[in-house]
């Protein structure tokens, strides 16, 4: 997926993001709790956040580690501006950089960070294994990486409905949206990147919307619909209509249609004896 398209779409939706990013807010709350449980604020002098979005997680972590230098990287300029305003309103200081983190990490000083955090960002990586090596490289030996991301069961009702819609229309099915890595995939890639003491947990979050179009509107409002946009014209409209019909006929209850998120939480420690090459 083109990084330019991702950056553009998230920038466009920066204002509406916080209203609709309900699961992402829950992820930020849990992630901040994980961070404060495993770290001593007096031992953390330099923090890096990957993909800060509008600054929800940034604000909480920055407040807790008030004496540390805090740097946040975000690919979407619109999101970055929202994050800056967010922190300024709370009197918090943070160094912000607009960049593609997958390239940016390799330009930073090795063994310079006491903590790296990231909420709901890693699923967008084009080269996760390569980027994890870069993150391990800039962490001090024994320093933690703590992040959350989405697992493959996310939106399973939607994917099932698309699969059946393709079949009903006599079409070959294609994936609509990102291919999420599993908890096992992340564990393997973290090990290969030189991380140790890896702890991974999964949690399912379920939201309910009045109808499928309301759900799709919410996805679009947080900028994530760029991962689902395939095809155009009459064929796409027919597919979308059939998908919605199947979804609501199969899954709708009195309260509305369910939408499932598989959330993966990860804690890992940078190895003390690994040499990193780009």
From Swiss-Prot:
Entries under Pfam families matching the protein: Methyltransf_23
Molecular function terms from GO: carboxyl-O-methyltransferase activity; malonyl-CoA methyltransferase activity
Source organism, top-level taxon: Bacteria
Annotated pathway: Cofactor biosynthesis; biotin biosynthesis
Enzyme Commission number, as recorded: 2.1.1.197
Family: Belongs to the methyltransferase superfamily.
Species, as recorded: Brevibacillus brevis (strain 47 / JCM 6285 / NBRC 100599)
Disulfide bonds: none
Name of the gene encoding the protein in the UniProt record: bioC
Protein name stated in the entry: Malonyl-[acyl-carrier protein] O-methyltransferase
Recorded catalytic activity of this chain's protein: malonyl-[ACP] + S-adenosyl-L-methionine = malonyl-[ACP] methyl ester + S-adenosyl-L-homocysteine
NCBIfam families found in the cross-reference section: BioC
Keyword annotations: Biotin biosynthesis, Methyltransferase, S-adenosyl-L-methionine, Transferase
InterPro entries associated with the record: BioC, Malonyl-ACP_OMT, SAM-dependent_MTases_sf
């Amino acid at each position: 997926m083109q990084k330019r398209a991702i950056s553009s779409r998230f920038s466009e939706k920066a204002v509406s993001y916080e209203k609709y990013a309900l699961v992402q807010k829950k992820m930020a709350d849990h992630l901040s709790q994980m961070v404060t449980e495993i770290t001593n604020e007096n031992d953390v002098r330099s923090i890096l956040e990957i993909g800060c979005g509008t600054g929800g997680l940034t604000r909480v972590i920055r407040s807790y580690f008030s004496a540390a230098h805090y740097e946040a990287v975000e690919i979407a300029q619109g999101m970055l501006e929202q994050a800056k305003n967010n922190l300024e309103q709370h009197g918090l200081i943070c160094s912000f950089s607009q960049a593609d983190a997958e390239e940016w990490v390799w330009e930073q000083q090795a063994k310079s960070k006491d903590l790296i955090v990231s909420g709901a960002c890693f699923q967008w990586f084009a080269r996760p294994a390569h980027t994890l090596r870069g993150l391990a490289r800039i962490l001090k030996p024994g320093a933690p990486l703590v992040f959350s991301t989405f697992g493959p069961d996310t939106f399973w009702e939607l994917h099932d409905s698309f699969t059946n819609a393709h079949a009903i229309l006599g079409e070959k099915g294609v994936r609509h949206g990102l291919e999420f890595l599993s908890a096992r995939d992340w564990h393997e890639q973290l090990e290969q990147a030189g991380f140790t003491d890896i702890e991974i947990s999964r949690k399912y979050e379920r939201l309910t919307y009045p109808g499928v179009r309301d759900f799709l509107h919410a996805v679009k409002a947080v900028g994530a619909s760029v991962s689902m946009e395939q095809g155009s014209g009459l064929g796409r409209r027919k597919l979308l209509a059939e998908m919605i019909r199947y979804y609501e006929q199969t899954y709708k209850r009195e309260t509305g249609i369910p939408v499932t998120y598989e959330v993966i939480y990860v804690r890992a420690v940078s190895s003390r004896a690994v040499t990193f090459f780009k």
